[in-house]
């Protein structure tokens, strides 16, 4: 199974997010393959949930659309299994972004057993307090799955505590609030990333609010990569099952921007 750190071995990483089941699970599968061809180094697959508290309207609406198609967690595992097999198997790391509730309702042991089976490298759980990470991580680690920590602008003491315990990569949240596209990112990301790097040597990628190539380049200059969600989900929302070319072009332009940052 591809490990998260592999995503950062070829220079600065571009990490797109897609909401599973939005406009149908078959389209999600095809779009992941397209994003990989366009240069994605790792893909975050969102498991739709009825109360996604960290998400802005774009991803909330995608979750609602996906749930209305009747998509279930088992369907998402089946999709990942298909992505990982065959001549055109996806080999880059794939991680789930989900909330505590879907994992607990599905059953933690069963969830992480299937993650291992289909080739999920890690999970990101935005509503999980750091203090509760151990409980989930103890089950995840049995199955070789890393639990990615999010670090938002906060005190150095808290950054130290979270960074020292981090695994896979650190998801550095560019601004407080929910996900979504922002015209400007006002947080001093450079200082936060430098602080994180005092306490860990694992990669740090920045997300929340990045939508333009110049923003991705700026963030990748001070970190190890850029994460983009809402802008990708918006392309799928606008083009439905005909988003192939628009997605390819967008991901390719964002990948080129982060590579420029590392040049």
Each predicted region: which residue ranges?
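Glycine-rich beta-to-alpha transition loops that act as phosphate-gripper elements at the mouths
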Residues: 19-24, 97-105, 129-130, 150-154, ...
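Alpha/beta catalytic cores of nucleotide-metabolism and tRNA/nucleoside-modifying enzymes
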Residues: 194-202, 211-263
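Conserved, mostly hydrophobic/aromatic
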Residues: 16, 35, 46, 115, ...
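Active-site-adjacent beta->alpha loops and helix N-cap segments on the catalytic face
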Residues: 1-7, 50-61, 68-81, 104-110, ...
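Glycine-rich phosphate-binding active-site loops on the catalytic face of alpha/beta enzymes
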Residues: 41-51, 120-124, 129-132, 174-180, ...
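N-terminal amphipathic alpha-helix/helix-capping segment at the start of soluble metabolic enzymes
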Residues: 1-17, 79-85, 262-263
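Hydrophobic faces of well-ordered beta-strands that scaffold small-molecule active sites
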Residues: 14-18, 43-45, 94-98, 123-125, ...
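Catalytic cores of alpha/beta
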Residues: 25-36, 154-164, 206, 210-226
């Amino acid at each position: 199974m591809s490990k998260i750190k592999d995503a950062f071995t070829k220079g600065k990483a571009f990490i797109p997010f897609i909401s599973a089941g939005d406009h149908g699970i078959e389209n999600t599968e095809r779009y992941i393959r397209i994003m990989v061809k366009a240069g994605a180094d790792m893909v975050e697959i969102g498991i739709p949930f009825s109360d996604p508290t960290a998400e802005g309207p774009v991803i909330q609406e995608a979750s609602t659309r996906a749930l209305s198609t009747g998509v279930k967690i088992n369907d998402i595992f089946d999709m990942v299994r298909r992505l990982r097999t065959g001549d055109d198997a996806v080999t880059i790391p794939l991680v789930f972004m989900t909330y505590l509730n879907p994992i607990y309702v599905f059953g933690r042991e069963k969830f992480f057993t299937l993650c291992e089976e289909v080739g999920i490298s890690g999970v990101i759980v935005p509503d999980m307090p750091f203090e509760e990470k151990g409980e989930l991580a103890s089950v995840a680690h049995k199955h070789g799955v890393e639990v990615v920590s999010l670090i938002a602008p906060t005190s150095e003491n808290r950054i130290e505590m979270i960074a020292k315990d981090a695994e896979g990569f650190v998801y550095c949240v560019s601004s407080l609030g929910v996900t979504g596209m922002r015209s400007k990112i006002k947080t001093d990301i450079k200082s936060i990333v430098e602080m994180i790097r005092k306490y860990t040597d694992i990669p740090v990628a920045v997300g929340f609010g990045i939508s333009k190539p110049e923003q991705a380049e700026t963030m990748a200059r001070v970190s190890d990569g850029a994460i983009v969600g809402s802008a990708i989900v918006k392309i799928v929302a606008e083009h439905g099952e005909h988003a192939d070319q628009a997605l390819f072009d967008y991901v390719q332009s964002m990948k080129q921007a982060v590579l420029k940052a590392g040049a």
